[in-house]
Amino acid sequence: MSAASPPSADSPASTHPARRAWMAVMARSARADLEAALNRAMEGLPLPAFDWLRPPEIGLAMVRGRIGGTGDAFNLGEATVTRATLRLRDERDEGTIVGVACHLGRDRRRAELAAIADALLQTPQHHARLQAQLIAPLASQLAAQHAQRQQDAASTRVEFFTMVRGD
């Protein structure tokens, strides 16, 4: 009996960290970017048939903060979130594949697209292509936007210094 090797981070069978990463990328991406990238990645193929387990719905989530960033928690306020859950229809019956999505805002179509992409990323036939053509471009776009925001903030930074008296 040989020991089974752990799944790689790129395999659809990998556990939470890889899935958490691609879901975070989709949650932070704009709908237009997500839709365009998903259409390119599917290469003209129609989106798969699915059944809604939870159609896109809008609700509120309590946003919590911490005093000083590390202290006691307090309720900062509420934020609007949209979530969706679907199950791919698979005539081969290889198992149930469930896609989920949750993001800030009220965009139901964005939640639907993210849930479909999440489900497809869990299938062996679509995983590698979607990682390369959907998640990687969206992640690099988000990184570029983040770098631009940091650069804009850095240009307004003020450096304070003190001089020693009496020397």
Per-region residue spans from a language model:
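Cysteine/selenocysteine-centered motifs that mediate thiol-based redox chemistry or coordinate metal-sulfur cofactors
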Residues: 16, 122-167
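Non-catalytic, beta-rich accessory domains that mediate macromolecular interactions or localization
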Residues: 12-14, 18-22, 33, 93, ...
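Generic structural motif
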Residues: 89-91, 106, 163-165
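Charge-rich, low-complexity N-terminal segments
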Residues: 1-46
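Structured beta-strand/loop patches that form or line metal/cofactor-binding pockets in enzymes
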Residues: 40-95, 101-103
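A hydrophobic, small-residue-rich beta->alpha segment in the mid-to-C-terminal subdomain
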Residues: 94-136
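Residues that form generic nucleotide/phosphate-binding pockets
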Residues: 25, 37-44, 119, 133, ...
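Electropositive phosphate-/nucleotide-binding environments in soluble metabolic enzymes
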Residues: 28, 32, 80, 107-114, ...
